[in-house]
Curated annotation (Swiss-Prot):
SMART domains named in the record: RPOLD
Keywords attached to this entry: DNA-directed RNA polymerase, Nucleotidyltransferase, Transcription, Transferase
Entry GO MF terms: DNA binding; DNA-directed RNA polymerase activity; protein dimerization activity
Protein name: DNA-directed RNA polymerase subunit alpha
EC id: 2.7.7.6
Reactions listed under catalytic activity: RNA(n) + a ribonucleoside 5'-triphosphate = RNA(n+1) + diphosphate
A GO cellular component entry from the record: cytoplasm
Region (Alpha C-terminal domain (alpha-CTD)): 245-326
Gene behind this protein: rpoA
Length: 326
């Protein structure tokens, strides 16, 4: 079945309204495709992008969320609501425990949270609480990576969830605050029944609006690829009981002599052996944070020089006794 007669957008206009807002206009689409793609991208943007949020809090002198704390203007419920407004971003890890300790008269902001080199606070001026003279606030904040909105009562927690003084928070992980789309009429030569898709997006600053749309598009492509390959099968590396695995596949990815950026991206995804790498698809690798098309092309070229490709399948991998690296 041929589909090359369908129009694809030839005009793509990206307007950066602010560092956290953008408007993307694409045209022309065949009639109906504007709503089809616009709605799919909107739903993915709102629900499926990874982000970071406070998930648990322990406050010195507080037993539960309905307590009050002497010297703090806000009650604990309001303080927790303010805390959930702090936008954070973790680099090279999926969770962290942070501390906020401040005393004396003044305003407590996100800037007062003690962070390491791999934790970034996007809105450091966000107000968390107000302290009166003699007031003191000392808390431990657990930050985790996740997707969408996850109520605290359904999120699995490590250890004893009944620990006195630990408050489990409802977590809004999504870095996208608002997204809407509009479909307008477009024209190409004599055709006037075409669609123009306009997407307005606002993020919390943890992710660039354009990158958010690119990520959502990759997620959609990855999901649709299942339908495109209904009758196809991925190449399989045949392994018989009498055969041993190609020694090349047992070598660490460091032997490929990739750039430091590419090598670090692979290790962050627990890809330590060449055998691990060749089983990943291009789509899967492009979802890796900080790994772009340039790094992907580098990986493909290095593998091709060894007679290997991405998207291969290995039976009985990993082999018994393979040492875990990392």
């Amino acid at each position: 079945m041929q589909s090359n007669s369908l129009l694809k957008p030839r005009i793509i206009d990206v307007q950066s309204v602010s560092p956290v807002q953008a408007r993307v206009t694409m045209e022309p689409f065949e009639r109906g495709f504007g709503h089809t793609l616009g709605n799919a991208l909107r739903r993915i943007l709102l629900s499926s992008l990874p982000g970071y949020a406070p998930t648990e809090v322990s406050i010195e002198g507080v037993l539960h969320e309905y307590s009050t704390l002497d010297g703090v203007r806000e009650d604990i419920v309001d303080l927790l609501l303010n805390l959930k407004g702090v936008v954070l971003k973790l680099h090279s890890r999926s969770e962290a425990t942070l501390r906020l300790a401040k005393s004396g008269d003044g305003v407590v902001t996100a800037r007062d949270i003690e962070v390491g080199h791999d934790v970034e606070i996007i809105n450091p001026d966000h107000v968390i609480a107000h302290l009166a003279p003699g007031g003191k606030l000392d808390m431990q904040i657990k930050v985790e990576e996740g997707r969408g909105y996850v109520p605290g009562n359904v999120r699995p927690a490590a250890g004893d969830t009944k620990t006195i003084g630990r408050v489990v928070l409802d977590a809004s992980f999504s870095p996208v605050r608002r997204v809407s789309y509009l479909v307008e009429s477009a024209r190409v030569e004599q055709r006037t029944d075409l669609d123009r898709l306009v997407i307005d997006i606002e993020t919390n600053g943890a992710v660039d609006p354009e990158e958010a749309i690119r990520y959502a598009a990759r997620v959609l492509m990855d999901q649709l690829s299942v339908f495109a390959d209904l009758e196809g099968t991925a190449p399989v590396v045949e392994q018989s009981a009498a055969q041993t695995i190609d020694p090349v596949l047992l070598r660490p990815v460091d032997d490929l002599e990739l750039t430091v950026r590419s090598a670090n991206c692979l290790k962050a995804e627990n890809i330590y052996y060449i055998g691990d790498l060749i089983q990943r698809t291009e789509t899967e690798l492009l979802k890796t944070p900080n790994l772009g098309r340039k790094s992907l092309n580098e990986i493909k070229e290095v593998l091709a020089s060894r007679g290997l490709t991405l998207g291969m399948k290995l039976e009985n991998w990993p082999p018994a006794g393979l040492e875990k690296l990392g």
